[in-house]
Regions:
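Catalytic strand-loop segment that frames the active site of acyl-thioester-processing enzymes
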Residues: 1-27, 131-152
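Generic structural detector for well-ordered beta-strands
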Residues: 12-15, 62, 109
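A glycine-rich, hydrophobic loop/mini-helix early in the fold
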Residues: 35-37
């Protein structure tokens, strides 16, 4: 098994001019790439060192605040759901200076695959989702559960 339940993975990124759009704020394509990196790092740690994960789908990604060039952003990541061959991680963008709410939140679903590219069970036993999740993880897990019920 990977990281102990309750552990968070932190990812920090400096927003550079090459990351910006014509408004001088974080470009959506770069945002998606950064979020995917943070989510993959979180899912990899959750699944264990022998993980061979692929992104199945972005369940939800919301950017609540524009991020300017020169700001350092923090992604907090945590596993919020696990099944036989998949792990769902949530991301929470730590509030920017002078703000009280997150600049971003997201949920992404990753699947463990074998050499054939087909799903394979994750290492260790499937665990029930923690019942004692604290904010913001409880709300993100509940939102992910509703979105998982929608088949793509």
């Amino acid at each position: 098994m990977g990281m102990p339940p309750g552990d968070e993975i932190l990812t920090h990124r400096l927003i550079l001019p090459r990351d910006a759009n014509h408004h001088g704020t974080l470009y959506a394509g770069v945002l998606l790439s950064m979020a995917l990196e943070a989510a993959y790092a979180t899912s990899y740690r959750a699944a264990g060192l022998n993980a061979n994960l692929v992104l199945k789908r972005v369940l939800d990604l919301r950017c609540h605040e524009p991020v300017r060039i020169g700001q350092v952003v923090e992604f907090r990541g945590r596993e919020v759901h696990r099944a036989r061959a998949q792990v769902v991680v949530a991301l929470y963008g730590t509030p920017l200076p002078g703000r009280s709410s997150p600049w971003l939140d997201a949920m992404m679903q990753f699947v463990q695959v074998g050499d054939s590219g087909r799903p394979e069970p994750l290492e260790g036993e499937a665990t029930a989702p923690p019942a004692d999740l604290l904010p913001p993880w409880l709300a993100l897990r509940d939102r992910a559960s509703r979105l998982l019920a929608i088949r793509s």
